[in-house]
Structure formats: structure tokens, C-alpha cells
């Protein structure tokens, strides 16, 4: 599992990016957030996640808010 910080997240569109120190930003889709109900992330929020290879490159999976 990696840890990072939410760089930005557009709740209307349902996606954003997670910043990982010393690495490229990682795409995150709302469906990857482990949370019941409304799935969203806040800018600057700390998260833990796995990186998987998606159709358009690396993306976050199993995202957990810290």
C-alpha cells in the first residue's frame, strides 16, 4: 500500500489525482474509494491506496482515508 495526499478531486465528475512524494501523480476514480454512501475525497486529505494498471496507465485502487 502507498500513502499520498489528494491533489484535487472533482466530485461532480467523480475523479481526481493523488500526489505521492517523489513519484508521478496517480489517477483516482470515485469507484476506487472504500467508503459507504457518497464517495468523495477532499483536497489535501491523506489516503492509503494500491496502484493498479488501468486502461490509461496507473490508477489508485482500494483507497482508504487516513
Swiss-Prot record:
GO terms for molecular function: nucleic acid binding. Disulfide bonds: none annotated. Residues 1-66 form the CSD domain. Keywords: Cytoplasm. The keyword Cytoplasm applies. It is found in: Cytoplasm. SUPFAM superfamilies: Nucleic acid-binding proteins. Transmembrane segments: none annotated. InterPro entries: Cold_shock_CspA (IPR012156), Cold_shock_domain (IPR050181), CSD (IPR011129), CSD_CS (IPR019844), CSP_DNA-bd (IPR002059), NA-bd_OB-fold (IPR012340). PROSITE patterns: CSD_1, CSD_2. Pfam families: CSD (PF00313). GO terms for cellular component: cytoplasm. It comes from the Bacteria. Involved in cold stress response. This is Cold shock protein CspA. The gene is cspA.
Amino acid at each position: 500500500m502507498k500513502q499520498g495526499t489528494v491533489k484535487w478531486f472533482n466530485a461532480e465528475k467523480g475523479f481526481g489525482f493523488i500526489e505521492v512524494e517523489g513519484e508521478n501523480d496517480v489517477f483516482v476514480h470515485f469507484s476506487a474509494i472504500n467508503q459507504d454512501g457518497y464517495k468523495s475525497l477532499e483536497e489535501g486529505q491523506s489516503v492509503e491506496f494500491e496502484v493498479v494498471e488501468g486502461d490509461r496507465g496507473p490508477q489508485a485502487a482500494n483507497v482508504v482515508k487516513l
